[in-house]
């Protein structure tokens, strides 16, 4: 209807000029006046996004808006994404325990959802944060990340991220040799396959670089300087993030 369109146009205008308070209020009002309209869940979702853009002090309010969407429109496709955003906001607020529950509910409630891997990886992030230096907790995270890499059709960028975090959990729990194996296999998966290396996005290249720099560090600590140098030179050759760090480390090894 014309009335509905007017709300959408008004909110878009406010958002365009950076008036996120008015944009949020307009979208919230649309959802309140037309709760049965198919656009109502989208309006709440966008209201929460505008709220988030207002700054960290408004994250709790954004969490409530995402929760309202999930509570009122449990069968809407946006339900899953609202819960993901809710979990992400809770993490940003350092409420890792609360965020973990949100992700676990998504994993258990929607085991075949196409975005399950995001919930899985996000849960692992929460568990890593909560584990601290607890070996049992870190071991649990390592198992979850290992299983995550077995999920079908896992995007390449997420493969690189999951592998790096798996190795990080192993290193923190003292399993250096296993971590070295994970890092080596991850590097080989991408560097050894030119097509995969090219297909990596910016995030994937970042996580691959972290893996390779970490692998180089382990080799250095084990006095295997030839392998460390080889890994660093691959970082340089593929122009990965942290290239300057790799150059510096190669220079130090050669001195």
What is the meaning of each model-derived region?
Residues 1-255:
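Acidic, polar-rich low-complexity tracts and alpha-helical solenoid repeat scaffolds
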């Amino acid at each position: 209807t014309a009335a509905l369109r007017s709300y959408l146009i008004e909110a878009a205008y406010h958002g365009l000029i950076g008036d996120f308070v008015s944009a949020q209020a307009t979208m919230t009002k649309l959802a309140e006046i037309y709760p049965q309209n198919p656009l109502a869940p989208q309006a709440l979702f966008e209201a929460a996004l505008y709220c988030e853009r207002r700054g960290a002090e408004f994250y709790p309010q954004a969490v409530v808006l995402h929760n309202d969407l999930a509570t009122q429109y449990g069968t809407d496709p946006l339900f899953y994404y609202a819960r993901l955003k809710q979990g992400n906001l809770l993490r940003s607020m350092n409420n890792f325990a609360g965020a973990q529950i949100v992700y676990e509910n998504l994993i258990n409630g929607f085991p075949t959802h196409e975005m399950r891997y995001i919930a899985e990886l996000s849960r692992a992030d929460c568990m890593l944060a909560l584990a601290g230096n607890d070996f049992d907790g870190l071991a649990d995270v390592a198992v979850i990340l290992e299983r995550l890499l077995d999920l079908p059709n896992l995007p390449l960028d997420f493969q690189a991220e999951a592998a790096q975090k798996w190795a990080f959990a192993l290193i923190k729990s003292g399993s250096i040799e296993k971590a070295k194996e994970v890092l080596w296999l991850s590097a080989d998966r991408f560097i050894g396959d030119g097509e995969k290396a090219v297909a990596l996005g910016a995030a994937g290249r970042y996580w691959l670089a972290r893996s390779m720099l970490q692998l180089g560090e382990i080799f250095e600590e084990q006095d295997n300087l030839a392998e460390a140098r080889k890994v660093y030179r691959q970082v340089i050759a593929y122009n990965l993030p942290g290239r300057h760090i790799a150059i510096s480390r190669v220079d130090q090894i050669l001195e």
